[in-house]
Swiss-Prot record:
It comes from the Bacteria. GO terms for cellular component: ribonucleoprotein complex; ribosome. One of its GO terms (molecular function) is structural constituent of ribosome. Disulfide bonds: none annotated. The gene is rplI. This is Large ribosomal subunit protein bL9. NCBIfam families: L9. Binds to the 23S rRNA. Belongs to the bacterial ribosomal protein bL9 family. One of its GO terms (biological process) is translation. InterPro entries: Ribosomal_bL9, Ribosomal_bL9/RNase_H1_N, Ribosomal_bL9_bac/chp, Ribosomal_bL9_C, Ribosomal_bL9_C_sf, Ribosomal_bL9_N, Ribosomal_bL9_N_sf.
Length: 149
């Protein structure tokens, strides 16, 4: 099925590209999410008329994500306190939700879906590097310090 991409899709294409994808992927994911439209003559003409507007919107989203990444990098570290045992293991764990709340409390708005924990939830005290994916192309990292209450 031929579709026109309205957003940059990893491993597929950029804004405005006409790509051939499987029908189910287009019908069940790309089109309902607003990431693509079917490549009919009417849609192609409509897209060409709106191309500059859509590309400006994508560029604005990218610039906003880069600005937030710079703010996160400027924080250097965020401290989270949690109950822990004698050997430095936490009672429970620190998940993406707690990290997102701590960074938001520090002054930078972050959603929990933007936090990437490569090894799963944090279960020990100490310093941990946490990565953030704020946009398809914008990544940053932050040091999270977990201390005992």
């Amino acid at each position: 099925m031929q579709v026109i991409l309205l957003d940059k899709i990893v491993h597929l294409g950029n804004v405005g590209d006409q790509v051939n994808v499987k029908s189910g992927f287009a019908r069940n994911f790309l089109i309902p999410q607003g990431k693509a439209v079917m490549a009919t003559k009417a849609n192609i003409e409509h897209f060409e008329a709106r191309r500059a507007e859509i590309e400006a919107k994508v560029a604005a989203e990218l610039a906003a994500a880069q600005a937030r990444a710079a703010q996160i990098a400027a924080l250097e570290a965020v401290t989270i306190s949690s109950k822990a045992g004698d050997e430095g293991r936490l009672f429970g764990s620190i998940t993406t939700r707690e990290i997102a709340e701590a960074v938001t409390a520090a002054g930078v708005e972050v959603a929990k879906s933007e936090v990437r924990l490569s090894t799963g939830p944090i279960r020990t005290l100490g310093d941990h590097e946490v990565k953030f994916q704020l946009h398809g192309e914008v990544f940053t990292a932050l040091n999270v310090i977990v201390v005992a209450e």
